[in-house]
Amino acid sequence: MKKALITILAVFLLGVGVFFGYEYATEPKIVDGVMSKKIDDKGRPIGLTSTFEPGDTVYFSAKRNRFWIDKAQIVWYKGEIAPENRFLVEEEVIVNKAKYFSTELSVPEGLEEGHYGVTIYVKGSDIMETKAEFDVKK
């Protein structure tokens, strides 16, 4: 009886361990992509928004969800998020102290009015982790 109970308990614990290990490995490694008007001293987004004016500096931030991820690639799009609409690719974006990947888009003559998008990938991966979209209006 005691041996059977120990065996059942061991199988149950192994199953729970496999389940949580699978969940941990397959969930997104970078989450919560947001657009903001500022970034604080620690690197967290402030003033979340999805609408900007042409002269604004646009900030994109996404939170790291796995401790071993320290570099990312961020891609900016003009229009729909599609390969042909890419206009800026930022390689080697490093996680900050607040555990966010953050970058900014600033154009001296101002951004054109329209719809934009941003995606983020773990460095070396083709799998999009999260995205955000925003509009530029006068």
Regions found by a protein language model. Give the residues of each.
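Contiguous segments within soluble domain cores/interaction surfaces
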Residues: 20-107, 111-123, 127-130
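Positively charged n-region of N-terminal signal peptides that target proteins for export
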Residues: 1-4
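Short beta-strand edge segments in extracellular beta-sheet folds
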Residues: 133-138
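General helical structural elements
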Residues: 6-7, 90
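Hydrophobic membrane-insertion alpha-helices, especially the h-region
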Residues: 7-19
